[in-house]
């Protein structure tokens, strides 16, 4: 059967890309390997001081830009349902005025392990939007990479050689060649046909296009919204947000909340408040910072590598200094 691939033109700190995470996760869960999802980094913010027409010192401009962006995050969150944490939000600073480091980190990870790179992209977004971390900092990026099973030393090497920077430049060129003017944007294609979409999309749009491109041969799994199925979903991804369950199983918000609350009462899920929403986790899940079979690297070792790597990256990093 011919495979369909969805390309998302994106940036790790794009709030509407964060808002489309439930759809991307639903596609992964419902279609499996019949539909691939790939990410092309476009570079949202090269220099925060030029994003808005603001006056004042560089520090004042950045502080105001952070405040404007926080307001935008809240507005977007109210529409797409993924939570954001804007308390003490200071994503950008004089030393870290760009979102390019996060994209370069993705490209560095992709050179090591393409699947782990997608997990890293998810963690960068999560750390940015619900944990309010400054994810352009190399020490933060190293820790996040280690969390998803990427060896910190290899990650630092890939980040600093310049090849990841070149890959990012090529990705930006792909965006321009495809006429991309905003994120997220999508290209859905099979061997002979491609369809472009601009902006935030709902799951029904992708169902329709996948059905059209496959002539009805590729269909999502039909899963009822049972407690067992939701538990299986959570076991697969370990953590999620309520709207991701809502989108995957075609529920309304009230029904979703009822099912989540029942799973929490039954001891199958845990919930923690994050920003203006809550993060769910499968009960008794292992901590995010843990040794992994692939790397054998634990949180302490990752922290040591992070400390050593920060000095190395400081002499190489062209963006965000």
Predicted regions and their residues:
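Residue-level recognition of the N-termini of beta-strands and the immediately preceding loop/turn
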Residues: 4, 35-37, 184
């Amino acid at each position: 059967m011919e495979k369909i691939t969805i390309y998302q033109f994106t940036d790790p700190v794009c709030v509407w890309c964060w808002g489309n995470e439930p759809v991307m996760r639903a596609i992964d869960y419902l279609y499996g390997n019949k539909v691939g999802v790939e990410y092309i980094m476009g570079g949202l913010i090269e220099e925060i001081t030029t994003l808005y027409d603001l006056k004042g010192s560089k520090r004042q401009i950045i502080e105001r830009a952070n405040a404007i962006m926080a307001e935008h995050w809240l507005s977007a969150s109210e529409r797409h349902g993924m939570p954001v944490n804007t308390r003490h939000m200071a994503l950008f600073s004089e030393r870290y005025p760009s979102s390019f480091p996060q994209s370069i980190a993705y490209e560095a990870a992709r050179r090591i392990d393409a699947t782990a790179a997608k997990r890293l992209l998810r963690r960068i977004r999560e750390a940015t939007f619900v944990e309010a971390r400054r994810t352009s900092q190399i020490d933060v990026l190293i820790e996040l990479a280690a969390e998803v099973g990427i060896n910190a030393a290899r990650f630092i090497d890939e980040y600093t050689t310049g090849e990841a920077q070149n890959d990012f430049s090529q990705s930006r060129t792909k965006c321009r060649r495809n006429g991309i003017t905003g994120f997220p944007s999508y290209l859905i294609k099979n061997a002979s046909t491609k369809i472009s979409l601009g902006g935030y999309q709902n799951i029904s749009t992708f169902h329709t296009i996948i059905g059209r491109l496959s002539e009805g041969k590729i269909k999502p799994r039909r899963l009822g919204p049972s407690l067992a199925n939701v538990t299986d979903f959570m076991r697969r991804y370990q953590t999620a947000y309520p709207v991701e369950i809502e989108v995957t199983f075609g529920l309304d918000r009230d029904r979703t909340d009822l099912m989540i609350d029942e799973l929490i009462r039954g001891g199958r899920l845990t919930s923690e408040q994050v920003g203006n929403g809550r993060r769910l986790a499968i009960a008794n899940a292992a901590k995010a910072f843990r040794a992994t079979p692939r790397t054998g690297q634990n949180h302490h070792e990752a922290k040591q590598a992070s400390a050593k790597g920060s000095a190395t990256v400081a002499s190489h990093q062209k963006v965000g200094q």
